[in-house]
């Protein structure tokens, strides 16, 4: 069975980059009728917070990305310890004691010599007495996985054939000196034991994937299918990492972005398929094809979400917004008309409140000095509400006959005086929704 996972760390709020990874894995699982696991990578006790776990679930629920089960890495530490013991027994795990300063000096020396900054495995030459002395001086060391210096290859679902020389990669640290299990080994153990068949993540994980393939093999397992999607950049190609604080999913939700607008964009961004507003997750899943995505960095502009949201709302039937409109105080008899009139003139649902305020209380008249007498006379000819479908036509015909004005000179001053706006819905519809007679 196809099984995928989304494995966020609860150290902050989800952002659009996280969503891309979650959505791809979700759609692969759902398209195949498989399992989608939400795995909370909470092995860092200092940075992992319960409120972020709650926020992750809240964001995914808002988007409709439902999971089949949830796992917590903090509850699986015994499994990682067993894997570490197995690697030690196989001679693939060793303790190292260099300080960050020492490692930095080694890196600089290698770079100055024109060599790749790869850990030199000096710790392998330490005797047991030397290790004991270093532990007494510095505390417990880190535990590194000893890579086989051979080429690691796989066929990537997006990038194609990948080949990485393990000799050009440092032996990865899997357990810190304080005992904290790091992502690399925890992810390997979880992916194998949970039966994960497909892993889709950002292209910044390519080297990490190579080392994980070797770790899986050392533990006696094959590896899932891997695919690495491109990283998002800002609209000018700038690094998105500097702007992620403004691109948290909770912030986009607060700004009124519709879930399907966000999902529609993220499901196609970076692919050869055009971005189209989908009416449902099922429609997105049906059209999803990982092979259409490329390796080039993908530009993301949050401004694109607003016209997509507007387009989605313009096609939304009244039944889906009836409760929201009732909550605004719109009379039931006028609620559906209000939606039909307002929806073509809103960008987000929050704009509905402004339109109802205009219809309920009237707009702030926008009247040029030379039009003031004309508007005053026109308003005097308008009866009290309620107004019907014929009110605008009958009223403007009477005003036209009395003033001699016609065309834009007739209609625009009246629109601006009634609504305070130069453009908007058809005035015949506006009049039907007005709750009070306009005044200057």
From Swiss-Prot:
Function (record text): Catalyzes the attachment of glutamate to tRNA(Glu) in a two-step reaction: glutamate is first activated by ATP to form Glu-AMP and then transferred to the acceptor end of tRNA(Glu).
Gene Ontology CC annotation, any one: cytoplasm
Principal EC category: ligase
Catalytic activity: tRNA(Glu) + L-glutamate + ATP = L-glutamyl-tRNA(Glu) + AMP + diphosphate
Subunit-structure text: Monomer.
Pfam families: Anticodon_2, tRNA-synt_1c
An example molecular function term from Gene Ontology annotations: ATP binding
Keywords: Aminoacyl-tRNA synthetase, ATP-binding, Cytoplasm, Ligase, Nucleotide-binding, Protein biosynthesis
Cellular localization per UniProt: Cytoplasm
A Gene Ontology BP annotation from the UniProt entry: glutamyl-tRNA aminoacylation
Source domain of life: Bacteria
Binding residues annotated for ATP, in chain numbering: 242
Motif 'HIGH' region, residue numbers: 8-18
Keyword Nucleotide-binding in annotation: yes
Residue ranges of the motif 'KMSKS' region: 239-243
InterPro entries to which the protein is assigned, alphabetical: aa-tRNA-synth_I_cd-bd (IPR045462), aa-tRNA-synth_I_codon-bd_sub2 (IPR020751), aa-tRNA-synth_I_CS (IPR001412), aa_tRNA-synth_I_cd-bd_sf (IPR008925), Glu-tRNA-ligase_bac/mito (IPR004527), Glu/Gln-tRNA-synth (IPR000924), Glu/Gln-tRNA-synth_Ib_cat-dom (IPR020058), GluQ/Sye (IPR049940)
Family classification: Belongs to the class-I aminoacyl-tRNA synthetase family. Glutamate--tRNA ligase type 1 subfamily.
Enzyme nomenclature, EC number: 6.1.1.17
Protein name: Glutamate--tRNA ligase 2
């Amino acid at each position: 069975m196809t099984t995928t996972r989304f494995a966020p760390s609860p150290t902050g709020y989800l952002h659009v980059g996280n969503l891309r990874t979650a959505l791809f894995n979700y759609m692969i699982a759902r398209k195949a009728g498989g399992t989608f696991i939400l795995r909370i990578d909470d092995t860092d006790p200092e940075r992992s917070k319960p409120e972020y776990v709650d926020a992750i679930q809240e964001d995914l629920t808002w988007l409709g990305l439902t999971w089949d089960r949830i796992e917590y890495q903090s509850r699986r530490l015994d499994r990682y310890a067993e894997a570490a013991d197995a690697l030690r027994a196989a001679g693939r795990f060793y303790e190292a004691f260099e300080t960050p300063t020492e490692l930095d000096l080694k890196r600089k020396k290698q770079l100055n010599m024109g060599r790749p900054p790869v850990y030199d495995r000096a710790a392998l030459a330490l005797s047991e007495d030397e290790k004991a002395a270093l532990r007494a001086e510095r505390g417990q060391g880190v535990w590194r996985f000893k890579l086989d210096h051979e080429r690691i290859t796989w066929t990537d679902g997006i990038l194609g054939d990948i080949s990485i020389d393990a000799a050009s990669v440092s032996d990865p640290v899997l357990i810190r000196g304080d005992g904290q299990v790091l992502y690399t080994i925890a992810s390997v153990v979880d992916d194998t034991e949970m039966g994960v068949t497909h892993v889709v993540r950002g292209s910044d994980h390519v080297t990490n994937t190579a080392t994980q393939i070797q770790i899986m093999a050392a533990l006696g397992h094959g590896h899932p299918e891997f695919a690495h999607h491109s990283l998002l950049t800002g609209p000018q190609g700038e690094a998105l990492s500097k702007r992620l604080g403004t691109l948290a999913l909770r912030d986009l939700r607060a700004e009124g972005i519709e879930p399907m607008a966000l999902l529609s964009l993220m499901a196609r961004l970076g692919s050869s398929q055009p971005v189209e507003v989908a009416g449902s997750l099922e429609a997105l899943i049906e059209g999803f094809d990982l092979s259409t995505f490329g390796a080039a960095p993908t530009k993301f502009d949050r401004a694109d979400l607003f016209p997509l949201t507007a387009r989605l709302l313009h096609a939304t039937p009244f039944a889906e917004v009836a409760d929201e409109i009732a909550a605004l105080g719109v009379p039931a008899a006028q609620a559906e008309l209000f939606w039909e009139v307002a929806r073509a003139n809103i960008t987000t649902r929050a704009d509905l409140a402004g339109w109802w305020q205009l219809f309920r209380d009237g707009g702030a008249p926008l009247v040029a000095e030379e039009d003031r007498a004309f508007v005053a006379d026109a308003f005097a000819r308008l009866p009290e509400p309620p107004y019907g479908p014929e009110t605008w036509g009958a009223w403007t015909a009477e005003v036209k006959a009395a003033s001699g004005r016609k065309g834009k000179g007739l209609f625009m001053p009246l629109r601006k005086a009634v609504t305070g706006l130069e453009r908007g819905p058809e005035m015949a519809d506006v009049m039907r929704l007005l709750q009070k007679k306009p005044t200057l």
